[in-house]
């Protein structure tokens, strides 16, 4: 006789075991109609699952975040149903939920095409219209093996082998199609109407490039049409803002097969890169950092001593010379410890703050490379602070404020911060972890902003704070970090002399604000759709003549703008002024200056912005002041 306690405290008694759906029906037909699953004693279960004893129950509907995830997971199974009807010879692998969607990996003798994807989506809609029930059957292990053996689903059998402890498994039947899953899933296909397949890509079995290649079909699903439409609109906008397309259109950079994951910066893109570097150099100098430069290639023994060889070897590029093995550095930290170790350090010398625009290389899988967002060769605004345990709090607090100020300069006000604390496997004693975690939490509280705790997500060598930016499309990008490290200073023999004339290891704080320059520039390109604020624009002003008689005056204006530190060019082509304005507008140049006979005679310029706003006629000095004012405001200034 189970007694069910609902979220509002109401209780319902039943004479016998009762399913989640039956409880929903006892509350009302409207709720039952919208029941996707249930949360029984804080565990998600299927709507058909029985409750046999007293329990708490929350009915999950499409309005709940869990309901949306269940809809997405069930849509992945629906992909399997449609694919097996259209392509019976393929083998289904795995179909998990991901952020804002789902995918299904499939082994197919031939790659799927966009036409295939359209056919799969159409078949999915036909199946949804059949309004069939999804049937769950808990099945003994041997029967599950027999089921998938009969169906020739070898990948499912391999997955079963990975779960030797499971004596029975959930099989979900979509009519003649069956899939294996822990669930829960929707009770009926009526919940799956608001979906769309989005793309096809390649993947590897178990994510290992040494294994066979699979076809991955991506999709998204939502609880209603409006949410789906809004998502599709965001995706379309994101495609328009794709940094690879804009990078090509604005002549910023290119990638090519001969150097996978390495960026060929063009003059325009390199100007943006240099603006970032010069800005960050001044920020670091103003905040007590010493800029250093360390080698690109270092003997492999250092990486063995630091622990990177044991844990990171697959991602390291290596080389050999004169009987010695070397690695191209994937990160700067061990090298910065070598700089710190030169000369005896006293507690009076701490903190020591080292910074480097460190060029690093990591052997990322070719399938994961993505424009300049995911590369093999990159530069970090890397820094390491060597301090005492007592100095952790102040150093972290100062870094948080510095990071938030930098993000504001780039136009990012919405910053998410997460504190990751001790994992089960870790180094260092608990008192040190207590101190470090409290120091980081107190520093976050002092910043006066909300932050999220991630228990157990810290690195084995210390807790960390991660900083993530939200862009104009609502996408979240993890960029900055500060991490306490109790391990590397010990491994690499870093020490200082204490006030008691004893030797002690410093705490090492790994920190970065932008992260990878390449990735951060990619984020900026997509955030601004290439319409960079004046301080980052490769060309800040273009001076154009109406007829040949103003050509010399245009060149003189450009020369004066350059003398004042502006990035300016001229356009003296024998084209109509309207054509030149349109073309330079497409290049996202913030300011377009036009000279006719009147402007030449008066020594003025007619100024308009790339958005078409006419700022009128002004002196050259006034225009210089206008641009310098805009540059001083950095990302806070919007060119209208």
UniProtKB/Swiss-Prot annotation:
Zn(2+) binds at residues 333, 384, 510. InterPro entries: aa-tRNA-synt_IIb, aa-tRNA-synth_II, aa-tRNA-synth_II/BPL/LPL, Anticodon-bd, Anticodon-bd_dom_sf, Beta-grasp_dom_sf, TGS, TGS-like. GO terms for cellular component: cytosol. GO terms for molecular function: ATP binding; metal ion binding; threonine-tRNA ligase activity; tRNA binding. Signal peptide: none annotated. It catalyses: tRNA(Thr) + L-threonine + ATP = L-threonyl-tRNA(Thr) + AMP + diphosphate + H(+). It is found in: Cytoplasm. Its EC number is 6.1.1.3. Residues 242-533 are annotated as: Catalytic. Its cofactor is Zn(2+). SUPFAM superfamilies: Class II aaRS ABD-related, Class II aaRS and biotin synthetases, TGS-like, ThrRS/AlaRS common domain. Residues 1-61 form the TGS domain. Keywords: Aminoacyl-tRNA synthetase, ATP-binding, Cytoplasm, Ligase, Metal-binding, Nucleotide-binding, Protein biosynthesis, RNA-binding, tRNA-binding, Zinc. It is an enzyme of class 6 (ligase). Its main location: cytoplasm. It comes from the Bacteria. Binds 1 zinc ion per subunit. HAMAP family: Thr_tRNA_synth. Catalyzes the attachment of threonine to tRNA(Thr) in a two-step reaction: L-threonine is first activated by ATP to form Thr-AMP and then transferred to the acceptor end of tRNA(Thr). Also edits incorrectly charged L-seryl-tRNA(Thr). Homodimer. This is Threonine--tRNA ligase.
């Amino acid at each position: 006789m189970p007694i069910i306690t609902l979220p509002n405290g109401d209780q319902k008694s039943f004479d016998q075991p009762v399913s989640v759906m039956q409880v929903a029906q006892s509350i009302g037909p409207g709720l039952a109609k919208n029941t996707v699953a249930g949360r029984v004693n804080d565990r998600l279960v299927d709507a058909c699952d029985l409750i046999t004893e007293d329990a708490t129950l929350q009915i999950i509907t499409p309005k709940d975040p869990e309901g949306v995830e269940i809809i997405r997971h069930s849509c992945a199974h629906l992909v399997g149903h449609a694919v097996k009807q259209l392509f019976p010879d393929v083998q289904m692998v795995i179909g998990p939920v991901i952020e804002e969607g789902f995918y299904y990996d499939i082994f197919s003798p031939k790659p799927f095409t966009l036409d295939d994807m359209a056919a799969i989506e159409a078949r999915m809609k036909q199946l949804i219209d059949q309004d069939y029930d999804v049937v769950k059957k808990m099945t003994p292990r041997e029967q599950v093996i027999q089921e998938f053996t009969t169906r020739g689903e070898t990948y499912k059998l391999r997955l079963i082998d990975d779960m030797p402890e499971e004596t029975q498994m959930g099989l979900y039947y979509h009519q003649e199609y069956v899939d294996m899953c822990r669930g829960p899933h929707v009770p009926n296909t009526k919940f799956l109407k608001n979906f769309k397949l989005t793309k096809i890509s390649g993947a590897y079995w178990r994510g290992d490039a040494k294994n066979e290649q699979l076809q991955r079909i991506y999709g998204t699903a939502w609880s209603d049409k409006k949410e789906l439409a809004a998502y599709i609109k965001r995706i379309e906008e994101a495609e328009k803002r794709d940094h690879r397309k804009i990078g090509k259109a604005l002549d910023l950079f290119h990638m090519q097969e001969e150097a996978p994951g390495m960026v060929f910066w063009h003059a325009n893109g390199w100007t943006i890169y240099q603006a970032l570097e010069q800005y960050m150099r001044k920020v670091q100098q103003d905040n007590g950092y010493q800029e250093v430069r360390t080698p690109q290639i270092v003997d492999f023994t250092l990486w063995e001593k630091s622990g990177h060889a044991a844990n990171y070897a697959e991602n390291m590029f290596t080389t050999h010379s004169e009987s010695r093995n070397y690695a191209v550095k994937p990160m700067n930290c061990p090298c910065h410890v070598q700089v710190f170790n030169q000369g005896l350090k006293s507690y009076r010398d701490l903190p020591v703050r080292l910074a480097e625009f460190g060029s690093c290389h990591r052997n990322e899988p070719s399938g994961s490379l993505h424009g300049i967002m995911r590369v093999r060769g990159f530069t970090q605004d890397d820094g390491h602070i060597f301090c005492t345990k007592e100095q952790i709090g102040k150093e972290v607090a100062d870094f948080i404020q510095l990071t938030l100020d930098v993000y504001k300069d780039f136009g990012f006000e919405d910053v998410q911060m997460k504190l990751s604390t001790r994992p089960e496997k870790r180094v260092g004693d608990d008192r040190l972890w207590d101190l470090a975690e409290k120091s980081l939490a107190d520093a976050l509280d002092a910043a006066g902003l909300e932050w999220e705790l991630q228990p157990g997500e810290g690195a084995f060598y210390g807790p960390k704070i991660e900083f993530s930016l939200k862009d104009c499309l609502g996408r979240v990008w993890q960029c900055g970090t500060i991490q306490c490290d109790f391990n590397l200073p010990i491994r690499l023999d870093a020490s200082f002399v204490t006030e008691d004339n004893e030797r002690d290891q410093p705490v090492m704080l790994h920190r970065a604000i932008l992260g990878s320059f390449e990735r951060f520039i990619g984020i900026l390109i997509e955030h601004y759709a290439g319409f960079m604020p004046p301080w980052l624009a490769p060309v800040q002003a273009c001076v154009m003549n109406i007829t040949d008689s103003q050509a010399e005056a245009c060149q003189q204006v450009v020369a004066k703008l350059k003398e004042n530190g502006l990035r300016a060019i001229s356009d003296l082509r024998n084209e109509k002024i309207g054509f030149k304005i349109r073309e330079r507008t497409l290049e996202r140049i913030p300011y377009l200056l036009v000279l006719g006979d009147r402007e030449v005679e008066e020594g003025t310029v007619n100024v308009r912005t790339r958005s078409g706003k006419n700022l009128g006629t002004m002196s050259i000095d006034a225009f210089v002041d206008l641009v310098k004012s805009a540059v001083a405001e950095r990302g806070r200034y919007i060119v209208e």
